[in-house]
């Protein structure tokens, strides 16, 4: 099973990335709220085509998540169902490619939420805005960004984000994946 630290990180993903209305469950309206929040953060920089593509992706994501986690088939994914899904998933997950499809599809969407300039790289200012816009409790943003970039040796691009997201979800101990929660390891 998962240790308490892993459960805490999984709870963060549930609360922060999915349960947008904070009612303790994931439902269709949470995905609608995600689109609204995403548009607010990106200040209208989404084209209509991007918006439609993202909306279709979120609809697919919700179907896949429900199919994997909604044990009682009530069109609601509770925290307990979400945790049970992750306990099964993490037991066999060895890389990003082993993550559920809905989770893999979410990664570029989340990355775009940080990379508001659209240049494929999240710089310090964009990361600071991400922490502020999403109300992450980050005491020292530059220090956290330094961990993300390994002291400037690694570019904070989509591949780095994938690696950090995978580590956030699967690592049994504090490591660089915590930076996506605005925390140093």
Swiss-Prot record:
Keyword annotations from UniProtKB, A to Z: Calcium, Metal-binding, Muscle protein, Repeat
Signal peptide: none
Source domain of life: Eukaryota
Keyword set includes tRNA processing: no
Binding residue positions for Ca(2+) 1: 19, 21, 23, 25, 30
Residues annotated to bind Ca(2+) 3: 115, 117, 119, 126
Disulphide bond pairs: none
Molecular function terms, GO-annotated: calcium ion binding
Note: The sarcoplasmic calcium-binding proteins are abundant in the muscle of arthropods, mollusks, annelids, and protochordates.
Functional description taken from the UniProt entry: Like parvalbumins, SCPs seem to be more abundant in fast contracting muscles, but no functional relationship can be established from this distribution.
Protein name as catalogued: Sarcoplasmic calcium-binding proteins II, V, VI, and VII
């Amino acid at each position: 099973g998962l240790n308490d630290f892993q459960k805490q990180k999984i709870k963060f993903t549930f609360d922060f990335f999915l349960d947008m209305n904070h009612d303790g469950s994931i439902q269709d309206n949470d995905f609608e709220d995600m689109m609204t929040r995403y548009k607010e953060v990106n200040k209208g920089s989404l084209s209509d085509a991007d918006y439609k593509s993202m909306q279709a992706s979120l609809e697919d994501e919700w179907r896949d998540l429900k199919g994997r986690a909604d044990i009682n088939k009530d069109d609601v994914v509770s925290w307990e169902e979400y945790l049970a899904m992750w306990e099964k998933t993490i037991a066999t997950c060895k890389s990003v490619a082993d993550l559920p499809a809905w989770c893999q599809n979410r990664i570029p969407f989340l990355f775009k939420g940080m990379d508001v300039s659209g240049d494929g790289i999240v710089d310090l200012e964009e990361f600071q805005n991400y922490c502020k816009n999403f109300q992450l409790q980050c005491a020292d943003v530059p220090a956290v960004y330094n961990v993300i970039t390994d002291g400037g040796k690694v570019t904070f691009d989509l591949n780095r984000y994938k690696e950090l997201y995978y580590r956030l979800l699967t690592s049994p101990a504090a490591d660089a994946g915590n930076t996506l929660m605005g925390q140093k390891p």
